[in-house]
């Protein structure tokens, strides 16, 4: 008996059965019905093996004790348990298990029949859907074939249209080229006509002057041939046809022209200057450089207008001095003529001279995309005003300004971005208008600390690039 017991203990059947019970308990919810039944049957088999070994040990133990040894224990413990288990197993649980299995098999067969029916229906639906899909696919293939044919036709039409458009573009380019050539020819003719008209006007003025000279000469010849002084006095010449107004017109209108020109100079500063700045700012981002360009344009415009006025005055004096006679002096006659014929001033030549001077000025620079001609209308208006100011008595001129000079409260206003504690001018924004060294309209300047040193460094670089300093250049211009 002891050997059988030791063998059972070493077999560890109970421990293995416990592990299988725990594993089954964990996997019960995820296992299928067949897997759970297999697990249960396996445990029953293990239990029956262990029970068989225990009954063997029970028989051997009772045999070793004698025929009647352990009878009481078997009666009180084993027989009641066996009776209870067999009664329950045979009467209740086996019946319930059989009934449950019958019901389960019936339900399973019913579900299988339903599943087979549903699968048959699904298969029929799938076949019908497949048939309809095939029909739709055939329609789509037919539509695709028609679309491809239409696409080929469209490509052919598009190629034809492109060829036609290319021919039209070539023809239009030829027409455009011819139109541009015709336009350029028309512009050249128009310029030639303008030049001819200007020449005609000049010739008319010269003819009027020559007529005046002719009348003067004829009167002199008549006086020289007259025998008596009394007849000479009676044949005094008529007024020159050159003057269509009263004598001394320039002197009589000097005050009104002075007020008008000063007001126009202020309008250029307050309106036209900002228009020119807006044009330059589209090409130049540096505001200081833009203001320097505007100031240089104003100064150069006055210089070019003064030079043109001197040349124009010399020509008029030379022409009128030949046959001048009358109560007025030659200077008054010349001034009257210039005031009446300011339209003969060749302002475009002065504009070209200003732009040429600005291009060689080392203090200002421009971008490759920008030319100073973009503000030619601003320069033209300045030249006209400056030329008219030279006909005043006394004439008006702009003040000379230089970077690094001491700021003058009587001559300039400070710009809004100035350092109001600085005493030196960094650069000028607008020139002051002078009359006999007296300021009548203030200019505008920017004051900053350290302007003298920056001016000296710029002056050294300018001296290396130019043979004449700006001061000497200004003095030579004023002469």
Swiss-Prot record:
Localization annotation: Cytoplasm, Cytosol; Mitochondrion outer membrane; Mitochondrion matrix
Biased composition (Low complexity): 235-249
Principal location listed in the UniProt entry: cytoplasm
BP GO annotations: mitochondrial protein catabolic process; mitophagy by internal vacuole formation
Top-level lineage group: Eukaryota
Record's keyword terms, sorted: Coiled coil, Cytoplasm, Lipid-binding, Membrane, Mitochondrion, Mitochondrion outer membrane
Coiled coil: 109-161, 187-223
GO cellular component, one term: cytosol
Molecular function via GO: cardiolipin binding
A Pfam family annotated for this UniProt entry: MIEAP
Region of interest: Disordered: 220-251, 456-479
Disulfide-bond pairs as recorded: none
Protein's job: Key regulator of mitochondrial quality that mediates the repairing or degradation of unhealthy mitochondria in response to mitochondrial damage. Mediator of mitochondrial protein catabolic process (also named MALM) by mediating the degradation of damaged proteins inside mitochondria by promoting the accumulation in the mitochondrial matrix of hydrolases that are characteristic of the lysosomal lumen.
Record-stated family: Belongs to the MIEAP family.
Name listed for the protein in its UniProt record: Mitochondria-eating protein
Species this chain originates from: Gallus gallus (Chicken)
């Amino acid at each position: 008996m002891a050997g059988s017991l030791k063998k059972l203990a070493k077999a560890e059947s109970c421990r293995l059965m416990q592990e299988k019970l725990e594993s089954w308990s964990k996997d019960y919810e995820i296992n299928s019905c067949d897997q759970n039944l297999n697990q249960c049957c396996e445990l029953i088999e293990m239990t029956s093996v262990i029970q068989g070994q225990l009954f063997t040990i029970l028989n051997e133990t009772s045999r070793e004790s004698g025929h009647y040894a352990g009878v009481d224990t078997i009666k009180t413990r084993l027989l009641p348990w066996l009776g209870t288990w067999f009664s329950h197993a045979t009467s209740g649980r086996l019946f319930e298990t059989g009934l449950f299995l019958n019901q389960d098999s019936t339900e399973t067969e019913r579900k299988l029949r339903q599943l087979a029916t549903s699968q048959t229906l699904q298969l029929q639906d799938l076949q019908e859907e497949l048939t309809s899909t095939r029909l739709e696919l055939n329609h789509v293939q037919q539509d695709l074939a028609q679309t491809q044919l239409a696409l080929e036709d469209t490509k052919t039409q598009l190629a034809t249209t492109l060829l036609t458009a290319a021919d039209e573009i070539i023809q239009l380019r030829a027409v455009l080229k011819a139109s541009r050539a015709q336009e350029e020819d028309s512009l050249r003719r128009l310029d030639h006509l303008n030049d001819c008209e200007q020449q005609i006007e000049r010739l008319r003025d010269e003819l009027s002057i020559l007529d005046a000279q002719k009348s003067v000469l004829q009167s002199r010849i008549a006086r020289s041939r007259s025998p008596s002084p009394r007849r000479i006095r009676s044949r005094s010449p008529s007024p020159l046809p050159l003057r269509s107004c009263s004598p001394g017109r320039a002197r009589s209108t000097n005050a009104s022209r002075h007020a008008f020109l000063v007001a126009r100079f202020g309008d250029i500063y307050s309106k036209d200057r900002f228009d020119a700045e807006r044009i330059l700012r589209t090409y130049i981002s540096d505001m200081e450089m833009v203001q320097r360009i505007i100031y240089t344009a104003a100064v150069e415009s006055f210089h070019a207008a003064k030079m043109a006025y001197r040349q124009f005055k010399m020509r008029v004096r030379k022409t009128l001095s030949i046959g001048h006679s009358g109560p007025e002096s030659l200077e008054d006659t010349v001034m009257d003529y210039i005031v009446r014929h300011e339209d003969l001033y060749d302002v475009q030549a002065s504009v070209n001279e200003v732009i040429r001077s600005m291009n060689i000025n080392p203090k200002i620079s421009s971008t490759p995309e920008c030319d100073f001609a973009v503000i030619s209308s601003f320069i033209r208006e300045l030249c006209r005003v400056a030329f008219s100011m030279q006909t005043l008595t006394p004439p008006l001129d702009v003040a000379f300004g230089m970077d690094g000079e001491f700021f003058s409260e009587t001559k300039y206003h400070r710009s809004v971005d100035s350092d109001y504690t600085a005493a030196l001018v960094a650069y000028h924004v607008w020139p002051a208008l002078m009359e006999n060294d007296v300021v009548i309209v203030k200019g505008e300047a920017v004051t900053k600390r350290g302007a003298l040193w920056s001016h000296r460094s710029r002056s050294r670089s300018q001296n290396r690039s130019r043979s004449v300093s700006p001061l000497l250049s200004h003095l030579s211009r004023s002469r």
